[in-house]
Amino acid sequence: MSDNKFIIGSEEWCAFPALGVPAIKARVDSGARTSSIHAVNIRPFKREGEPWVSFELHPIQNSRKIILRCESKVVDRRNIKSSNGESEKRYVIASVIQLGGNAWEVELTLTNRDSMGYRMLLGREAMSNKTLVDPSESFCLGEKGDLEVEQLYGVKTAKKSGLKIGLLASNPDLYSNRRIIEAGEQRGHEMVFLNISQCYLKLDASSPEVHYRGGRVLNNVDAVIPRIRPSMTFYGCALTRHFESLNIEALNTSDAITRSRDKLFSLQLLQKNNLDIPTSGFANSPVDTKDLIDMVGGAPLIVKLLEGTQGKGVVLAETTKAAESVINAFKSLRVNLLVQEFIKEAQGKDLRCFVIDGKIVASIERTAAPGEFRANIHMGGSASIVSVSAAEKQLAIKAAKTMGLRVAGVDIIRSSRGPLLLEINSSPGLEGIESATGIDIAGAMIESIEKKLGWKAD
């Protein structure tokens, strides 16, 4: 037996200075071969060509008050069998452990230990030739009270920084994008504009990455806000999905955006969930044009390109002959379109309800410009504050939920048979609604991310 060995109990307080961990309670288990430490939001990245990993650590069991953000070089990735017999592939890091007045380097596997009794497990490999375990004792190297632990972490919480949030978009000068960047910075976060077309992906089971033009790796952002223009839907959703695979929070998920961008599919989902929509028709062949027109109640009617946005690709056909001509012309171009009843009693007006996390934060009434039937702000429409009914509120909230969107612009038209859903937008513009209402919607979007990630200002 070596004279250098020291006695430890079945539980001890450890420290990892290189990780910024001044105190963490460990379960000492000589029956376990490897050691592990609690880690969530684990994200691999490269530093000077070497594999690294970042992770978050809540060092105090059953407490989320203290969050440490740690980084370490990866020394391995191994299949580890847990106490319940399940195998998990974990990142392995090496760091110097301090136990009492002793210090040496140990290997740690990273895993979520929320369901365990301790934030750390000290296994026999880390203790080999260093310690003797007395399982009948606890804290042989000294106990730490709650006050002492809080004081040790007091410096850490005081220095807590904001989140790093990426805005996935195409034009940094658009009002909505400028406001989101501004709102995030005002709340103490690091905001990064990421041009979707300049991002590219590395698909690799062991080290997936998102790169930015020039080679910068983007795996270290805490969250992303997708603001994907229609022409970039496929690539933008693929990019968002890749961030999600890295456990990076997306304000709106790729699945939700994809659902909402498919106008036909979204109407089918709304219909399936018993949410009222204008009567609409969809057909493949020009042979069915006459029946399609009759199906929606005849002319006047609306013809919509399924790929259109901001009022573009939407035509009012005032007569049956005009409707047939427009539909057949579009069909000859091999584009997909919807035919929809025209709600004449709306008189060129509709509602835009801005929904965040299942609540309406602002509503406006949009009025079409003279001689125009489309109320979109981008088509010259005007916006004014409006009070929405309980039925309209319920319809907007249910529509956003059906799409799976945490942030949505829900368009509703008032008809003689009640409110009808027109469209659900996953990247709603902010200028018209913020200008009309004076509400800080961009700030509410940032707040949604803060709540989801459990972040609070100092």
Curated annotation (Swiss-Prot):
GO terms for biological process: protein modification process; SOS response; translation. Pfam families: RimK, Rimk_N, Zn_protease. Mn(2+) 2 binds at residues 423, 425. Binds 2 magnesium or manganese ions per subunit. Mg(2+) 1 binds at residues 411, 423. Gene3D superfamilies: 3.40.50.20, Acid Proteases, ATP-grasp fold, A domain, ATP-grasp fold, B domain. Mn(2+) 1 binds at residues 411, 423. It is an enzyme of class 6 (ligase). GO terms for cellular component: cytoplasm. Its EC number is 6.3.2.-. GO terms for molecular function: ATP binding; metal ion binding; ribosomal S6-glutamic acid ligase activity. Mg(2+) 2 binds at residues 423, 425. Keywords: ATP-binding, Ligase, Magnesium, Manganese, Metal-binding, Nucleotide-binding, Protein biosynthesis. Its cofactor is Mg(2+); Mn(2+). InterPro entries: ATP-grasp, ATP-grasp_RimK-type, ATP_grasp_subdomain_1, Peptidase_aspartic_dom_sf, Put_Zn_protease, RimK, Rimk_N, Rp_bS6_RimK/Lys_biosynth_LsyX. ATP binds at residues 304, 341-342, 350, 374-376. The keyword Cell wall biogenesis/degradation does not apply. Residues 1-162 are annotated as: Unknown. Residues 163-458 are annotated as: Alpha-L-glutamate ligase. Residues 267-450 form the ATP-grasp domain. In the C-terminal section; belongs to the RimK family. This is Probable alpha-L-glutamate ligase. It comes from Shewanella pealeana (strain ATCC 700345 / ANG-SQ1). The gene is rimK.
